[in-house]
Amino acid sequence: VRVYFDTGVFIDYLSTRGSANALLRSSERRGRAPADIAADAERLFEKVGRIHIGATSCLTYYEVEEALYRLLAQSAKGISRAETLLIPAARSITTQVQIVVELFNISVLDLTPGTVRLQLQQLDLQTRGIRAADALHAATAIAFDAELLVSADDAILNLDGILVNTQGRKIVCRDTDLALQLL
């Protein structure tokens, strides 16, 4: 099975691996505690890495760092030079994503003009209000011929059965716990 991972799955996995990362997943999602969410992400990465084909977009690197930076910056308001000093802390999660990619044999797909064109051709993404980053992830999953798109994002999950890969197959969109049941 060709499995595409949205950024949220990496955040799920890394949220229990570092004190700053824990800020990214501090509340329940769909009745699951952050520790359970992280465990589901780990099991999914392991399973896909062993017997399936996994991929994500290079956009994931930007999104994880920016998400952590925003949270750290909120807590450092009013502190001189905080923005500069927070960059190394936020950048560390990008390094961690690279390690996850290597540990679980996940391909990192380029964001190309073709990906942007594909995004622009997907009228459903526009009419359903799917914003730029999510739309680029959806287009990348389509181009990858994903059969399963795993996401923590409701906007992406609501695209279940709507996205069609280049082979003409509908893409199933699931959160980590339900993706594990499918695989």
Question: What role is predicted for each listed range?
Answer:
Residues 1-2, 17-33, 126, 138-183:
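Acidic, PIN/NYN-like endoribonuclease modules and their adjacent C-terminal/linker elements
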Residues 1-60, 68-81, 177-179:
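Short, well-structured N-terminal submotif of metal-dependent ribonuclease cores
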Residues 9-10, 48, 56, 83-122, ...:
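Anionic, Ser/Thr-rich low-complexity intrinsically disordered regions
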Residues 35-38, 91, 131:
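Short alpha-helix boundary/capping motifs
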Residues 39-42, 94, 135:
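Residue-level marker for well-ordered alpha-helical positions
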Residues 45, 98, 138:
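Short glycine-/small-residue-rich flexible loop motifs, especially phosphate/cofactor-binding loops
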Residues 102-154, 158:
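Active-site neighborhoods of divalent-metal-dependent phosphate/nucleic-acid chemistry enzymes
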